[in-house]
Amino acid sequence: MKKMMIATLAAASVLLAVANQAXAGATLDAVQKKGFVQCGISDGLPGFSYADADGKFSGIDVDICRGVAAAVFGDDTKVKYTPLTAKERFTALQSGEVDLLSRNTTWTSSRDAGMGMAFTGVTYYDGIGFLTHDKAGLKSAKELDGATVCIQAGTDTELNVADYFKANNMKYTPVTFDRSDESAKALESGRCDTLASDQSQLYALRIKLSNPAEWIVLPEVISKEPLGPVVRRGDDEWFSIVRWTLFAMLNAEEMGINSQNVDEKAANPATPDMAHLLGKEGDYGKDLKLDNKWAYNIIKQVGNYSEIFERNVGSESPLKIKRGQNNLWNNGGIQYAPPVR
């Protein structure tokens, strides 16, 4: 009996190992076979993923998708986008409808450990705040006792707002909507006293209101909201490719490499780490099953982290959000990437 149990356990272990091997690399193989990355994004958030009048998508989350395509194919245009609501996003990833979720999604323990998904990094450090009309005369979120609060359903915001009001002995009435645009319209129409969401999303929604200057973001940040790309758990190869796409952008900024000077830097790398990153020394692309110019292609076609931040949400964008904690570690922020070596 004991021998039979051992044999059964051994057989199960072999089957599990085979299954894991089958899953490893499956996404990259499928992506290369179909010729593009299918990327899940938001259903319309300026600065992160937003379509213009011609249907062209732009934003930080979109640029991560483009970066992955540049790494895999050497062509950042080989990506297709699937706009998803907060309720739809995880099912779309779990079912295989999308290869990657790059959709202003907060990294939490339950999502990372309990839903069969893995977060590859943090593209934007954020926190939940409140948007309200300046005529209300509010100076602090602690003045919101009794307020009606617009919230997007299926987001981390619902729980965080409940916790904040409870901790401060305040009452509120939540009004939920499936889409962020719907919650913004409800706020503008007077249905809600305030709108709660990630602060970056509040700035993005504010510019879509009729008179943006009349609306203010209250100073309190009531939670930690690290936003980043998500992949299915179990495919370490694909996980690494998506993770190192962001790391390449961060390393490039730290080394002073951007889309305009990358050819000059590649021709004469100043340090061994720069030579490794740009594919001039070593065989580091092999570890990712990619060409050694994978990072060069990301930087050349999409840019470094500073470039994607500033053009989408920073000084070159209508949002004018300051880098803050999204600065590099050596410039007062907490963004940091391991070296390519």
Swiss-Prot record:
Keywords: Amino-acid transport, Periplasm, Signal, Transport
Example GO biological process: amino acid transport
InterPro entries: Bact_solute-bind_prot3 (IPR051455), SBP_3_CS (IPR018313), Solute-binding_3/MltF_N (IPR001638)
Record-linked PANTHER family: AMINO ACID ABC TRANSPORTER PERMEASE, AMINO-ACID ABC TRANSPORTER-BINDING PROTEIN YHDW-RELATED
UniProt family annotation: Belongs to the bacterial solute-binding protein 3 family.
Localization per Swiss-Prot or TrEMBL: Periplasm
Gene3D superfamilies in alphabetical order: Periplasmic binding protein-like II
Cysteines engaged in disulfide bonds, as pairs: none
Gene Ontology CC: one annotated term: outer membrane-bounded periplasmic space
Superkingdom per UniProt: Bacteria
Biological role: Probably part of the binding-protein-dependent transport system YdhWXYZ for an amino acid.
Main location: periplasm
The protein, known as: Putative amino-acid ABC transporter-binding protein YhdW
